[in-house]
C-alpha cells in the first residue's frame, strides 16, 4: 500500500463542485463497501465474510496508516464517529456517555420535558388562563392547536435537511426552542400586572333585579398572541425530537434493539403529561401572585381563586436549556455506528417506484430535491398504509385523552377534578406500559418488518374487542329538576324556571349543582329557591329552599336548622366504575403496544436515507388527519348528546351542562370501533403489499447511492493492486 492518504473513497463525502476532495477510508470500511458491492452486482463473486474482521487478507491497524496532508477537519467522512466534546476539548468524563445508552438518557429527559410542558402544563393551565386573561374557549382552543400547526409546517423540512446534518446538534437546537417556548409562554404573567379580585358571587335566591346583557372587551385578551408564539416555538422544538432523534437512535443500535430504545424514548413523552398534571396541580394550589401574598379570606374553594400556573413553565425552561450542552457534545455518529450499520440487512419495501436510485451524491442538499424525495415516499404503498393506520389510531387516542375525564364525570356523577385524576391514572400509565411492552417484545423476538406489522395488527384487534367496554359503562341520568324531573309537579320539562323560583332571576350561565333531600339534583341554589346557606360546613349546606319538597333531613343535629340541600351532585347508583377503569386500562395497553412496532416498521420499509423524512411525513399527516381533527370530532359528537346548554343573559350559547349518558356511551363506541377498523384495515393492507428485498441485501449507509459507492470502491481496489 503506497501513498500518504491510504485508500481514497469519494463515496464517504459527497463531492463539491468547488472543492472536490477524497476522504480517507480505513481498510475495514473498504471491505464493508466491497461486500455490499458484490451483493448489488447480483452475487457474481463469492461473498468472503460478513465481518470485516474476518477478511482472508489481513488489514493493518489504522494507527499504522500515514497521516494525511490535509488540514485538520478536512478529512471528515460521512460517518463522523468521534469522542464527546467540543472542537479540541474532549474531557474523559464525557466519554462514559458517548454510547447509545448515554444518548437515550438525554433523549428521554428532553422528551419528558416536552411532554410535561406541551401536554401537561399547557392543558392544566388553560382554564386558569381563560379566567386571568378573559379569553373565550375558542381562543384558548386555538392556543392549544398552535403547537400542532407549527409541527405540521416544519416537520417535512426539518426531517429532510436534518437527515444529512448533525442530528445531536439539531436536538440541542430542539432543547433551546422548547426552553424558549416555555419561557415565552410564562411572560404574560410578568407583564399583565397584579391580579385584581372581583366581588364574590352568591348564587342564592335574593329576589334581585334581572342582569342586563352587557359585552365588554379587555386588553388582557391581547396576550393571546404571546401564548400562540410560545406554542409555535414549542412546536419548532418538538419537530427534531421525534423525527431526527428517533432516526439517530435507529442508526446507533442493532436492528433488534431499535424497538426497545424507541419504545423507552416514546414512553417518556407519555409520562411527561402525568408529571405535568401533578406538578401543575400542585402549583395551582399556590396563589397566582406568589410574591404579593393572598387575602386571608380567600381560599381555593372561592370561584375567584387563581393558582400560580406560570411557575411550572419557568422550571421547564431552565431544565430544557440545561440539556443544550449535553446534546451539543455528542459526535455526528456514536462510536461503533459503522460496524453496526455494516451488520444490518435491508428490509425496504421493494417495487419499481421506490428504488430511490439517484446518481447524484449531492441529492438531498438542495431544496430542489425536496419534492422528488417526498414524491418517492408517497409512492411507497406500504409506508402510506402504515401512516394512515397511525393517523386513525391517533384520532381516537387524542379524542379520548381530551374527553375521557368528561365521560367519567358525567357517567358516574364525579367532580371534574376527581374524574380528571382517574382518567390520567388510567390513560398515562397504560400508554407508557404499552409503548415499552411493544418495544420489548419486538426486540426480544427479533421481529422482521413483516412480523412487526403482524404483531401490531394483533394488538389492534384485541383493542378493538375491548372497545365495547363503553356500552357496559353506560349509566342512566339521575333525576334533574327542570330537565328529567319536574319541580314538585310544577313547571315544564326542559325549562329550569318554575313558579317556585320565578322571582329569583337566576343565571343559567352559573352552574353550581346541589343535591336536594328529595334525591333530585338542582342546577344551582338559586334554581332550587334556596334563601340561606351555611358555609362552614363541608359540603356547603342550604336551607329555606322553596323548590325542594322536604322528606328527610340531611343532618340529625337537633340544634341545627333544617338543611334541605348540600353542594355537589347527587351520588349515582351506577357501580360499574371499577370494572370500566380496569377494562379500559387493558384497552389502552393493547392500543399503545402497536405504537412502537408501527414506528419501527416505518423505519424499515423505507429507504435508509429517507427515514427521517418518513417520520416527518408521518407526524405531519398524523396531526393533520389525527390529533387536530380528533378532539374536534369527539367534541362535536359529545355536544350532540347535550340536553341542557349554558345560555347567558345575552342569549349566547356556551358550554353544555347536562348530557344524555346512554347516547354518549353509544356514540363513543361508534367512533372508537370505526377508527379501530380503519387502523386494522390499513395495517393488514400493508402486510399484504409488503415485498421484502432479497435475503442478505445490506443497508447502504455510507452513500446516497449504492451503485456509486460500489464502482468507486472497486476502482480504488484495482488501483491498489496495480500500485502494489
Swiss-Prot record:
Stretches of the chain found on the membrane's Cytoplasmic side: 1-101, 163-168, 250-269, 332-376, 443-446, 604-612, 691-724
Species lineage: Eukaryota, Metazoa, Chordata, Craniata, Vertebrata
Compartmental location: Basolateral cell membrane; Apical cell membrane
Gene3D superfamilies, alphabetized: MFS general substrate transporter like domains (1.20.1250.20)
Chain segments carrying region Disordered: 1-80
Domain Kazal-like: 494-549
Membrane topology: Multi-pass membrane protein
InterPro entries: Kazal_dom, Kazal_dom_sf, MFS_dom, MFS_trans_sf, OATP
Inducing or repressing factors: Expression is significantly decreased in renal failure.
Disulfide cross-links: 500-530, 506-526, 515-547
Domain of life, per lineage: Eukaryota
Segments on the Extracellular face: 123-141, 194-218, 291-306, 399-418, 471-580, 639-672
Task performed by this protein: Mediates the transport of organic anions such as steroids (estrone 3-sulfate, chenodeoxycholate, glycocholate) and thyroid hormones (3,3',5-triiodo-L-thyronine (T3), L-thyroxine (T4)), in the kidney. Capable of transporting cAMP and pharmacological substances such as digoxin, ouabain and methotrexate. Transport is independent of sodium, chloride ion, and ATP. Transport activity is stimulated by an acidic extracellular environment due to increased substrate affinity to the transporter. The driving force for this transport activity is currently not known.
Coiled coil stretches, renumbered: none
NCBIfam families found in the cross-reference section: oat
Name of the protein in question: Solute carrier organic anion transporter family member 4C1
Similarity annotation: Belongs to the organo anion transporter (TC 2.A.60) family.
Composition-biased stretches (Polar residues): 25-46
Record field: catalytic activity: estrone 3-sulfate(out) = estrone 3-sulfate(in); L-thyroxine(out) = L-thyroxine(in); 3,3',5-triiodo-L-thyronine(out) = 3,3',5-triiodo-L-thyronine(in); chenodeoxycholate(out) = chenodeoxycholate(in)
TM regions (residue ranges): 102-122, 142-162, 169-193, 219-249, 270-290, 307-331, 377-398, 419-442, 447-470, 581-603, 613-638, 673-690
Amino acid at each position: 500500500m503506497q501513498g500518504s492518504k491510504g485508500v481514497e473513497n469519494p463515496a464517504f463525502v459527497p463531492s463539491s463542485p468547488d472543492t472536490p476532495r477524497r476522504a480517507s477510508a480505513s481498510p475495514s470500511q473498504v471491505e464493508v463497501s466491497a461486500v455490499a458491492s458484490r451483493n448489488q452486482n447480483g452475487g457474481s463473486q463469492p461473498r468472503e465474510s460478513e465481518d470485516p474482521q474476518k477478511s482472508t487478507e489481513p488489514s493493518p491497524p489504522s494507527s499504522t496508516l500515514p497521516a494525511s496532508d490535509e488540514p485538520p477537519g478536512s478529512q471528515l467522512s460521512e460517518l463522523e464517529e468521534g469522542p464527546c466534546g467540543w472542537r479540541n476539548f474532549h474531557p474523559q468524563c464525557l466519554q462514559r456517555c458517548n454510547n447509545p445508552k448515554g444518548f437515550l438518557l438525554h433523549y428521554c429527559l428532553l422528551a419528558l420535558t416536552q411532554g410535561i410542558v406541551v401536554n401537561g402544563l399547557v392543558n392544566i393551565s388553560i382554564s386558569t388562563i381563560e379566567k386571568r386573561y378573559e379569553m373565550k374557549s375558542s381562543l384558548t382552543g386555538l392556543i392549544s392547536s398552535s403547537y400542532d400547526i407549527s409541527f405540521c409546517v416544519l416537520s417535512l423540512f426539518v426531517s429532510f435537511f436534518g437527515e444529512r446534518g448533525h442530528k445531536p446538534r439539531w436536538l440541542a437546537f430542539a432543547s433551546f426552542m422548547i426552553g424558549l417556548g416555555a419561557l415565552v409562554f410564562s411572560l404574560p404573567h410578568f407583564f399583565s400586572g397584579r391580579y385584581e379580585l372581583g366581588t364574590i358571587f352568591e348564587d342564592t335566591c335574593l329576589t334581585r333585579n334581572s342582569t342586563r346583557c352587557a359585552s365588554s372587551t379587555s386588553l388582557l385578551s391581547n396576550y393571546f398572541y404571546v401564548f400562540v408564539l410560545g406554542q409555535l416555538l414549542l412546536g419548532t422544538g418538538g419537530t427534531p425530537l421525534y423525527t431526527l432523534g428517533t432516526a439517530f437512535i435507529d442508526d446507533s443500535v442493532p436492528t433488534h434493539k431499535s424497538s426497545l430504545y424507541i419504545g423507552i424514548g416514546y414512553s417518556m413523552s407519555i409520562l411527561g403529561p402525568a408529571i405535568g398534571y401533578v406538578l401543575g396541580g400542585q402549583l395551582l394550589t399556590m396563589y397566582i401572585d406568589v410574591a404579593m401574598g393572598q387575602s386571608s379570606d380567600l381560599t381555593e374553594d372561592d370561584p375567584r381563586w387563581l393558582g400560580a400556573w406560570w411557575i411550572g413553565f419557568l422550571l421547564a425552561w431552565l431544565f430544557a436549556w440545561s440539556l443544550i450542552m449535553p446534546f451539543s457534545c455528542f459526535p455526528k455518529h456514536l462510536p461503533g455506528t459503522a460496524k453496526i450499520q455494516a451488520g444490518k440487512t435491508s428490509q425496504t419495501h421493494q417495487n419499481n417506484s421506490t428504488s430511490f436510485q439517484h446518481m447524484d451524491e449531492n441529492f438531498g442538499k438542495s431544496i430542489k430535491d425536496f419534492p422528488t424525495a417526498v414524491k418517492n415516499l408517497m409512492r411507497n404503498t406500504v409506508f402510506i398504509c402504515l401512516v394512515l393506520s397511525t393517523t386513525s389510531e391517533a384520532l381516537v387516542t387524542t379524542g379520548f385523552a381530551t374527553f375521557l375525564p368528561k365521560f367519567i364525570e358525567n357517567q358516574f356523577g364525579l367532580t371534574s377534578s376527581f374524574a380528571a385524576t382517574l382518567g390520567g391514572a388510567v390513560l398515562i400509565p397504560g400508554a407508557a406500559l404499552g409503548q415499552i411492552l411493544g418495544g420489548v417484545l419486538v426486540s426480544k423476538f427479533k421481529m422482521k418488518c413483516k412480523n412487526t406489522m403482524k404483531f401490531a395488527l394483533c394488538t389492534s384487534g384485541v383493542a378493538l374487542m375491548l372497545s365495547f367496554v363503553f356500552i357496559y359503562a353506560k349509566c342512566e341520568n339521575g333525576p334533574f329538576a327542570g330537565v328529567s324531573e319536574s319541580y314538585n309537579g310544577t313547571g315544564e320539562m326542559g325549562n329550569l324556571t318554575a313558579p317556585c323560583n320565578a322571582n329569583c332571576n337566576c343565571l343559567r350561565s352559573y352552574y353550581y349543582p346541589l343535591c336536594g333531600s328529595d334525591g333530585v339534583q338542582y342546577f344551582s341554589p338559586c334554581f332550587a329557591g334556596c334563601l340561606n346557606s351555611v358555609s362552614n360546613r363541608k359540603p356547603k349546606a342550604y336551607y329555606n329552599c322553596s323548590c325542594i319538597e322536604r322528606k328527610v333531613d340531611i343532618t340529625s343535629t337537633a340544634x341545627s336548622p333544617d338543611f334541605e340541600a348540600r353542594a355537589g351532585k347527587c351520588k349515582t347508583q351506577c357501580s360499574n366504575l371499577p370494572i370500566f377503569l380496569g377494562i379500559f386500562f387493558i384497552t389502552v395497553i393493547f392500543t399503545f403496544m402497536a405504537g412502537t412496532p408501527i414506528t419501527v416498521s416505518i423505519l424499515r420499509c423505507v429507504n435508509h436515507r429517507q427515514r427521517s423524512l418518513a417520520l416527518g411525513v408521518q407526524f405531519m399527516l398524523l396531526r393533520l388527519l389525527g390529533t387536530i381533527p380528533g378532539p374536534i370530532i369527539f367534541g362535536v359528537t359529545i355536544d350532540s348528546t347535550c340536553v341542557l346548554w349554558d345560555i347567558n343573559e345575552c342569549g349566547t350559547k356556551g358550554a353544555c351542562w347536562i348530557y344524555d349518558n346512554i347516547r354518549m356511551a353509544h356514540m363513543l363506541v361508534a367512533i372508537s370501533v370505526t377508527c379501530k377498523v380503519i387502523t386494522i384495515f390499513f395495517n393488514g393492507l400493508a402486510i399484504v403489499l409488503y415485498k421484502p428485498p432479497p435475503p442478505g441485501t445490506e443497508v447502504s449507509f455510507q452513500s446516497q447511492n449504492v451503485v456509486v459507492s460500489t464502482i468507486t470502491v472497486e476502482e480504488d481496489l484495482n488501483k491498489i493492486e496495480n500500485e502494489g
